[in-house]
Design a protein with these regions (language model features):
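Active-site bordering "gate/hinge" segments
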Residues: 1-259, 390, 396, 406-408
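Dual-mode signal for accessory low-complexity, basic/Gly-rich regions
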Residues: 289-358
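Short solvent-exposed loop/turn micro-motifs enriched in small/polar/acidic residues
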Residues: 11, 199-201, 271-273, 308, ...
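Short conserved micro-motifs at the rims of enzyme active sites and ligand-binding pockets
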Residues: 109, 152-154, 274, 302, ...
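Short linear motifs in exposed loops
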Residues: 219, 290-291, 401
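Extended hydrophobic packing segments that form well-structured cores
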Residues: 363-408
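Active-site lining segments that contact anionic ligands and/or coordinate catalytic metals
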Residues: 257-259, 275-277, 284-287, 310-314, ...
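Long, well-ordered mid-to-C-terminal structural blocks that present hydrophobic/aromatic surfaces
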Residues: 251-307
Length: 408
């Protein structure tokens, strides 16, 4: 891949994604297989004015070893130095850059029950610290092709060719070719106009129906709003784009208001385990049944992480006619696949989906209906025949999606 293109992509992530501010600290999280691209990111952060850039490396084989050999008690323990690091992060609010490149199946064989219990134990310490940081700092998730990931996406190609092909797909779908800054400005303007229309309707419910069996209704929070694209930090008003790429218009639904069944239309890679061809049934707002042809144990672990993991935290609208879907590529990565189809998310909701959320505490946003959970996992339900009908407070029905695409 042309070095200049990768440098431009790194600059896009830093300046349009995280929007690093002069004098701000930055933390980059990446897999061990990305030293060259991370080096580019570090340089771009400093060129943007960062005071210090730290890199935290991850490696799937090590996680497999840790979970296999450590006790659940040791896995779930947060040492004092770890807690102090988290508290320091909450105080200094560094910008966070996450680079995804891991093998979608790289954690197959992981003891899901053991890992899930350890995460639940750690969450008791992490949650109050994370809550104190809510909406106060910039973050962005972007991607770079790992070798195993590239071979998963393009199994018919050799390793080097697969990596090159995946780089091309990432740059195209991320609007990183040519003038990326201008492309994102235009894209955000389009997303904003759709949010404004949806917010003007006063929707209280969304009903989803498609030929694969999806027949599902979700309630919306009266004080909530649809958001998309760029966000602003609380207090400092720094604009950033948390997902590169992003095609979604989303909101957080009313906790505990969901009825019916939804069928997945794309695989889900959950913590390195593939979950495929699955369905989720909701009654009285909570998951009551899950089925999957592959990865059902992982799916059951997901929905039983805590009370909030059985409920929804997000409803996202993505047209079937989108750049990622039109690429014809199955990425086996939620960052991309969620932007190829309408999706829902189990778990934590977004406080900034409440109108004027800056005037409320996080707890007040929860009381209005924003779900709380240690997880937030997107799964795709969009199809070319998906119809979504909105219902307003007065009972008026409005067509939102028709045959997989915007109806307006």
């Amino acid at each position: 891949m042309d070095i200049k293109k990768l440098e431009s992509y790194a600059e896009l992530i830093v300046r349009v994604g995280a929007n690093i501010q002069k004098g701000q600290d930055v933390v980059i999280s990446a897999e061990l297989d990305q030293p060259e691209f991370v080096e580019m990111l570090v340089e771009q952060c400093y060129l943007a004015g960062a005071a210090e850039v730290r890199v935290e490396w991850t490696h799937q084989p090590l996680r497999l070893k840790h979970v296999k050999y450590q006790t659940v008690e040791r896995l779930g323990e947060i040492k004092d130095w770890e807690k102090q690091k988290l508290l320091h992060r909450a105080e200094t609010l560094p910008a966070m850059i996450y680079i995804e490149s891991a093998d979608p199946s790289g954690l197959d064989g992981l003891d899901q029950e053991k890992w899930g219990k350890s995460v639940q134990m750690r969450w008791k310490v992490i949650k109050p610290i994370r809550d104190s940081m809510e909406n106060k700092y910039q973050w962005v998730i972007a991607a770079a092709p790992g070798k195993a990931w590239a071979k998963k996406v393009f199994p018919e190609l050799g390793e080097a060719e697969a990596v090159e092909k995946l780089w091309e797909a990432i740059l195209y779908t991320s609007r990183a070719e040519g003038d990326g800054v201008k492309a994102w400005q235009e894209h955000n303007a389009d997303l904003k106009s759709r949010c404004e229309y949806l917010n003007s309707l006063g929707l209280r419910k969304l009903h989803y129906k498609s030929a694969n069996g999806t027949d599902f209704t979700v309630g919306l929070i009266p004080q909530a709003q649809f958001l998309a694209g760029a966000e602003d930090t609380l207090g400092t008003n720094v604009r950033f784009n948390p997902n590169i790429p992003s095609e979604e218009v989303f909101t957080s639904p009313m906790k505990g208001q969901a009825e019916g069944i939804v069928y997945s239309t794309r695989p889900l890679s959950y913590r390195g385990t593939m979950i495929e061809n699955f369905s989720i049934r909701f009654e009285n707002g909570k998951v009551t049944e899950v089925k999957a042809q592959k990865g059902e144990d992982a799916l059951k672990t997901l929905v039983n992480m805590d009370e909030g993991s059985k409920m929804l935290g997000e409803c996202a609208l993505v047209p079937f006619d989108s750049p990622i879907r039109n690429s014809g590529i199955m990425f086996y990565n939620t960052l991309f696949d969620e932007n190829a189809a309408c999706h829902l998310a189990l778990g934590d909701g977004f406080a900034n989906c409440i109108k004027d959320f800056e005037n409320y505490t996080l707890e007040q946003c929860r009381e209005m209906g924003i779900n709380s959970s240690m997880i937030h996992e997107d799964f795709m339900i969009g199809s070319e025949d998906l119809n979504i009908t909105g219902e307003t407070e007065s009972g008026e029905r409005v067509q939102i999606f028709k045959n997989g695409n915007w109806a307006f």
